[in-house]
Amino acid sequence: MPVAKLIQKTKSGVKPTTLALATILLVACAGGVEPPKPADLGPNVSLLGVKLAWTSQTGPVTFPLLAKAAGTTVAVAGGDGLVALLDARTGQDIWRTQIGNPVSAGVGSDGRYVAVITQANDVVTLEAGREIWRQKMPASSFTAPLVAGARVFVLSADRSVTAFDAASGRRLWAQSRPGEPLVLRQAGLLVAVGDTLVAGLSGRLVGMNPANGSSRWEVPIAVPRGTNDVERLVDLVANVNRQDDQLCVRAYQAAVGCVNTGRGTSLWVKPANGAQGLSGDDRFVYGTEIDGKVLAWKRVDGERAWESDRLKYRGLTAPLAVGRSIAIGDNTGTVHLLSREDGSPLNRLTTDGSAVVAAPLLVGETLVVVTRNGGIFGFRPE
């Protein structure tokens, strides 16, 4: 049964709790009703030539991983504290190191600096495989640090944003604001768009000055509604799609929307029931819903372009638009390549049989996939 991993904010920090996504699921579970089973996909139709180029390994991934590409490198981490920077062309280590503490969020990288957050609430930054500093945070974090502009930015579970000097670890500024008492135990939204730091704070997209954290603009994507904390939970999730100044994002189980970050204005918002982030191209924005539907919205106005229920109940990741396809991982370790035009199948790729834990990532010409068991797989066009 799918569950929402939630964190409850308290005066002394945050504490974890696990709550069902919907009362009906709790009732169904109590009544012994089996969850829906995915339909058989039938034989693979290989209409797009892709081959496995290399494999690597990290520790089992027990946290909300976001692998990070920078140039021809990809930064990854395992839950046990292993952090590695790989050459995405060959899969070979550039370096790997053990930081000595389990990881709760990562990875952030600009190709030079790599940053993760530990379960002890430490921000740890490495350079050339060597730890150069760590700083204690006042609250947990489940969002990968953002490394940009010689700074390391951290979005914490108490919805505070903190900036550090990437080389020295000196704290530059911190901004916090009141929010709802529950937050997701899932990677949130923290990205750079030009000279603006963009963060998801509750259901609002906030553009900040990276020099001091002051707010430049705010755009609501979802508004808290309901009579209890669970119903009022709104958070923006990781994996966004950017085209020039347009940033398209998802509010957990509430909406998808696109914002003009240059003007700080909403372009459109549409209701949607998904938990994973988005991808897109110049025509469409792509996403997966809680039940496994794959949807495409028209970028210009948010109207539905197509939907596919072929992958329902397969525990899908966020999609990645790559070439003429979109790539989506599932909970069996399969990567599905679907047509951007209508969602029809183009190919299926296999990994190690454990769930794909992060949206597939394109690094140069290599499609990088990471699984729950710590398998790292590089695929290339044939």
Briefly describe each language-model feature range:
Residues L26-A28:
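C-terminal motif of bacterial Sec signal peptides marking the signal peptidase cleavage site
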Residues G32-K68, W95-G111, I132-A148, R171-G194, ...:
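Extracytoplasmic beta-rich repeat domains
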Residues G78-G79, T118-Q119, S156-A157, G200-S202, ...:
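Structural signature of WD-repeat beta-propellers
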Residues D87-T90, E127-R130, D165-S168, P210-N212, ...:
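Short loop/turn segments that connect beta-strands within beta-propeller blades
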Residues T288-A296, E303-L337:
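Loop/turn-rich, solvent-exposed surfaces of beta-rich toroidal or solenoidal domains
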Residues T351-E382:
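Blade-level signature of beta-propeller repeat domains, shared across WD40, Kelch, NHL, RCC1
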